[in-house]
Amino acid sequence: MISEELKNDLKIKWDRMRDGMAKMGIDACLLTVDVNLYYTTGQIYSGYFYLPVDGEPWFLIKRPNGLSGHQVEYISKPEDIPPLFAERGIKMPKKLLLEADELTYNEYIRLDKVFQPEEAGNATAFMRN
């Protein structure tokens, strides 16, 4: 899914994000807004980018079809994520960053309900820093 020329650049961004998340005590970050997807993946797609503080990032794609690569999974709705993670042996995050300033209230509540973190933080403010 990620072109060879972007891999090093994106790894630097992911490592910088992980450093910030670790300092905040955050387990993972879930992004879905176009500008944040483009910044973190080099592409815009309908779906989610999941970056755990430890481990590989996941590309959770709703549309378009045809994207493939390492850690790419197709989902039809966010409720598909917990069973997918359970199948892959990925722990659900206790502390999760969501794009609070950019998602609609309903989208935010839906994602919070899907992940059921003990604590949710604001990924929007995090991404701006």
Predicted regions and their residues:
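Structural motif
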Residues: 32-34, 61-63, 98-103
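Compact, glycine/acidic-enriched structural inserts
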Residues: 60-87
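Flexible, acidic/His-enriched mid-domain "rim/lid" segments that flank
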Residues: 8-15, 80-129
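Short active-site-adjacent helix-start/loop capping segments
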Residues: 37-41, 58-60, 66-69, 105-106
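Generic alpha-helical propensity signal that fires on short helical segments
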Residues: 44-49, 55, 69, 77, ...
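Terminal domain-start leader segments
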Residues: 1-58, 90-92, 122, 127
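Helix N-cap / beta->alpha transition motif
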Residues: 52, 62-64, 104, 119
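Short secondary-structure transition/capping motifs
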Residues: 6, 38, 70-74, 100
